[in-house]
């Protein structure tokens, strides 16, 4: 297992800012510990909690930027929907998000191959109109993003030792 370390001062400073800054300390430290990007090799060196946090970061960034169609197009569908990510989030207390991800998983199974195909920028932009089934889920994520991110931050704060080692 990789030991992810954060400075106590950095944590305290981020906690005084907001939940995004607080989570950012954990996410950035984890990414730094694995060399910048999550892959099959370094994933084996992380805990389930650390992987789940990085998965939430990917989900958050992709869906807030371009919705579930973008997340799937960028190749994250398998990572988000074919693993136990939603189940772990449910265990963390994010039942509504987990329920939504199980629903989106059905759409991913139905449309994933079509969305992931190589295409031009114009063809990619047209996908948002071709797959309107994702729209309500995109909206639901955006509407609940603050609450869900806060719930993730609360879990991380409550179980810090699952994520990092705090240094003075």
Identify the meaning behind each predicted range.
Residues 1-69, 73-81, 88-168:
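Extended, alpha-helix-rich binding/interface surfaces that flank or overlap catalytic cores
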């Amino acid at each position: 297992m990789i030991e992810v370390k954060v400075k106590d001062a950095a944590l305290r400073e981020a906690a005084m800012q907001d939940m995004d800054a607080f989570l950012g300390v954990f996410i950035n430290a984890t990414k730094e510990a694995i060399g910048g990007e999550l892959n099959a090799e370094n994933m084996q060196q992380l805990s389930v909690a650390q992987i789940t946090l990085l998965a939430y970061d990917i989900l958050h960034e992709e869906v807030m930027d371009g919705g579930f169609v973008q997340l799937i197009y960028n190749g994250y569908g398998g990572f988000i929907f074919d693993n136990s990510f939603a189940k772990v989030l449910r265990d963390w207390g994010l039942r509504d998000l987990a329920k939504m991800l199980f629903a989106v998983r059905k759409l991913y199974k139905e449309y994933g191959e079509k969305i992931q195909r190589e295409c031009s920028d114009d063809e990619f932009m047209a996908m948002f109109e071709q797959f309107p089934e994702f729209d309500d889920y995109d909206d639901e994520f955006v509407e609940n993003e603050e609450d869900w991110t806060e719930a993730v931050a609360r879990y991380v704060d409550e179980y810090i030792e699952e994520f990092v080692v705090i240094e003075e």
